[in-house]
Amino acid sequence: MSDDQVLDCVIVGGGLAGLAAADRLRHRRVLVIEAADRVGGRIRSLPRGDYWLNLGAHMFGGPGTRIGDLAAELGLETRPIGRALIGMAMGGRRVFRGAVETFPFRLPLSVAARLSFIRMGLALRRGVAGAVHALGPRPGETAAEARARGLAWDNGATLAQRIGPLHPQIETILRAITERTGGDPAEMAAGYALRSFANVWSRHSPGCNLVGGSSLLPEALVRRIGDRILLGAEASAVEARDDVVTVACGSGSTARVVRARSAIVATPAFATKRIVRNLPPATAAALGAIRYGAFLSAAVLTDERSPMPWDRNYAISTPERAFSVVFDQASTLRGRGARAPGGSLMLFRGAKGAERLLQASDDQIASAFADDLAAEFPECRGRLREIVVQRWEAGAPFSFPGRAALQPALTMGLGPIFLAGDYLEFPNMEAAVATGWEAAEAVERRLVA
């Protein structure tokens, strides 16, 4: 593809939003520019025989969701998460089944801590009920309107403010179960956190796993997009002049300038602010105000020959450990027959806890996680075959009080440049695909005008 050619669209960023946009525009002359040596962004998995190691996003929507339908369209197999999403291991006690309302009475807590847990639970239940009522679909509402409404709901206070003072043990529990959303209770907006609880507090699984590992999705998109992806080419400038967008990327002998009639910038908010030239001041300020929380994950391949304590759970919270949650990535492979040997876990830490651990080396993190896993679950001692550490310094954009006020500046027209990414909505794979598709549709409308 010649640099003298004017493309229909250049897409900056090869994460899920960028790939989704490129896939929608694959009938056009497009080019995806990605700084890393692989696509997928925060989706990453590694095949390991009958299992796989998941290091990033792993919960897919089912049929009827954008991400679920896209996976099916690409011929990929997703399976419902048929295991409990709420379990806790704390103080030598395992509470893996039963209603969450019983946890205060089943965990080893003081009387004061039990009462604090109950107060927290009641506050969360009230908030979740409000979220379900307020965030339901409304007839005639556009996707952008629904997105803005979701961001604005209960956006004036943090989760910690909404719940009130807690016993120190319960503060630790709350931090552990909210870390996967990117922020701490004292940072994240109450509405954002309650929406996350609403997704999890269900008798039914909120999603599926992709059999074979999450990376199969971006890999399938790459096959369909074809050889129109440029890896290892970090964009340094995106600028619109006279209805032509120029993108400078690469450096030294690999430096090049790509020209196109339009551009979709699907990079994190802070990168978008850095590379897009001549942004309106309000948009630049809004992009700079988006906050990201760190994620740290360790994928663990195990070789056990007998059932393990996590077999009936998909997620187990571990408030007192170096990691805050254990995800059983092999759970969707467990049927009613004999249990196959081996397995795959993801050990996760997020927010401030992840930030602290990121100061250590990969070997130190792997050792700390392995020691704590064996301490919490002695059954796995000597059964850990491999540990792969993955650092996500910008793991997820989280909503904070006042975040909703930024949305108009983030969605205003920028001429031939369009923005996409999960920072525009509640951050998950569904949001990445939705914003990528919407940007692609806007490009298509511009091209045919």
Please report, for each region that a protein language model flagged, where it lies by residue:
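Conserved flavin/dinucleotide-binding core of flavoenzymes
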Residues: 4, 100, 310-312, 326-449
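Dinucleotide-binding Rossmann-like beta1-alpha1 core, especially the glycine-rich loop
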Residues: 51-134, 148-149
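Glycine-rich, N-terminal phosphate-binding loop of Rossmann-like dinucleotide-binding domains
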Residues: 64, 267-268, 422
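Hydrophobic/small residue at the entry helix of a nucleotide-binding pocket
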Residues: 16-17, 39, 435
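Mid-domain catalytic core of redox enzymes
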Residues: 4, 233-358, 375-376
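Active-site/ligand-binding neighborhood in enzyme catalytic cores
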Residues: 130-245
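N-terminal Rossmann-like FAD-binding beta1-loop-alpha1 element of flavoenzymes
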Residues: 7-32
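Glycine-rich FAD pyrophosphate-binding loop
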Residues: 26-48
